[in-house]
Amino acid sequence: VVEPYIIRDDVPTGEGSNYHLSKDMNFIGLGGCGGGLSEKIAVKRRWVHPISDKIPLDQAALIEPLSVGHHAYVRSGAKEGDVALVGGAGPIGLLLAAVLKAKGIKVIITELSKARKDKAREAGVADYILDPSEVDVVEEVKKLTNGEGVDVAFECTSVNKVLDTMVEACRPTAKVVIVSIWSHPATINVHSVVMKELDVRGTIAYCNDHAETIKLVEEGKINLEPFITQRIKLDELISEGFERLIHNNESAVKIIVNPNL
């Protein structure tokens, strides 16, 4: 599995480093060095992580986004027995929830889309799924946590109302982790953050997460098969790949492009 970074040679990449935040960081396929649809690419040894035959290659393609979820989990400081609220069951939200479940954390997902709610149920990554169009999420969370609120909340939508819900659903001294990449300014209820002494944290990509992520899959703690929603030929890349993701992304989690089909 390739950790698809382009990092300057003088940047430390060992344990404890933050190479993912380094100057001029970029990604293979976006910033050069070939791309994932190339027949072959050359990758520096540092960015290649071995996998066993316990992980089929099509599922191995999901290690990269799963590592995003793992890094968000690490940033949260969540531990076994905690209760987490995941705001949004898109691809990253679902994979994050899978990591949390594998780590022994009780997961509550809030999601509007029926297709995404169904996928969360199918994948078994949530203990509870709440639809904000049907229930008051904060009130339901309080009922599920003996009136206390969750230990950690993950915002995965870039929607301000969801961020507001994450803040209000937290117990005092909880963590709010912002997972999504916002293209627009957001507001946050600073009064709630202060009065409950909440920690608000960002998370981006991954940093020394791949090895532990691979281990979770190889040990059978995460099954990636449910997250592959479609396999397409290379000549279907536009119509069944990009256009589906642009116009009908609620039905897609991860689409595998296989030139050999």
Question: Which residues does each predicted region cover?
Answer:
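Mid-domain Rossmann-like dinucleotide-binding core that forms the NAD(H)/NADP(H) cofactor-binding site
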Residues: 55-134
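C-terminal hydrophobic helical "lid"/dimerization subdomain
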Residues: 164-168, 207, 211-261
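Conserved acidic E/D residue at the C-terminus of a beta-strand in Rossmann-like folds
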Residues: 111, 180, 204
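Glycine-rich phosphate/adenylate-binding loop and adjacent beta-alpha elements
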Residues: 1-48
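Conserved beta-strand positions in the Rossmann-like core of class I SAM-dependent methyltransferases
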Residues: 108, 177, 201
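Helix-to-beta-strand junctions that scaffold the AdoMet/dcAdoMet cofactor pocket
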Residues: 170-172
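Short amphipathic alpha-helix with an adjacent loop that forms part of the alpha/beta core around
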Residues: 136-146
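Rossmann-fold NAD(P)-binding glycine/threonine-rich loop
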Residues: 180-197, 208-210, 215
